[in-house]
């Protein structure tokens, strides 16, 4: 009986070896985008920090500590080996979809994360000023590839 269970488990797992999630279709993507834009909180909340190079620099500093492992140094996945191979794929923060969120929505995402996408929430880890500065930095991302590859992926 035990060998039968082991054989059944091996066959089942072997059958899953070639399985892979397919990318979402257009309808799924549009539905999810609609839902995200209508159900993510803080839609009308404004960034209280000044929109200036000092704030962007503070945001870049915080971003470089907390965000580069998944979003790359430039926020556009440059050098992140797994970015397009997980489901859902990690978005480029310069994409029209991400940039269409309000500042308040981006702050809400940073605070709460997006389950089950792998985007963690930072509430309690980062201060409000750090989070708002990251939002400001996201509005002024450098060109793709201009910041190099995160150190963790170069060795």
Language model features by range: what are they?
Residues 6-12:
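Sec-dependent N-terminal signal peptides
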Residues 24, 41-42, 64, 87, ...:
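Flexible coil segments in periplasmic/lumen-exposed cytochrome c-class electron-transfer proteins
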Residues 15-18:
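C-terminal motif of bacterial Sec signal peptides marking the signal peptidase cleavage site
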Residues 27-62, 149, 155:
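Electrostatic cytochrome c docking/interface patches
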Residues 1-5:
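Bacterial N-terminal signal peptides that target proteins for export
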């Amino acid at each position: 009986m035990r060998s039968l269970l082991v054989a059944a488990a091996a066959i089942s797992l072997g059958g899953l070896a070639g399985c892979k999630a397919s990318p979402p279709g257009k309808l799924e993507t549009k539905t999810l985008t609609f839902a995200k834009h209508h159900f993510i909180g803080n839609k009308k909340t404004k960034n209280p920090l000044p929109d200036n190079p000092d704030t962007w620099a503070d945001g870049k500093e915080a971003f470089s500590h907390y965000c580069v492992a998944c979003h790359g140094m430039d926020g556009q996945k440059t050098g992140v080996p797994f970015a397009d191979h997980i489901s859902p794929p990690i978005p480029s923060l310069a994409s029209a979809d991400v940039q269409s969120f309000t500042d308040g929505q981006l702050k809400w995402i940073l605070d709460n994360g997006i389950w089950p996408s792998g985007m963690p929430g930072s509430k309690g880890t980062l201060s409000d000023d750090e989070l708002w500065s990251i939002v400001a930095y996201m509005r002024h991302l450098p060109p793709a590839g201009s910041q190099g590859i995160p150190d963790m992926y170069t060795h």
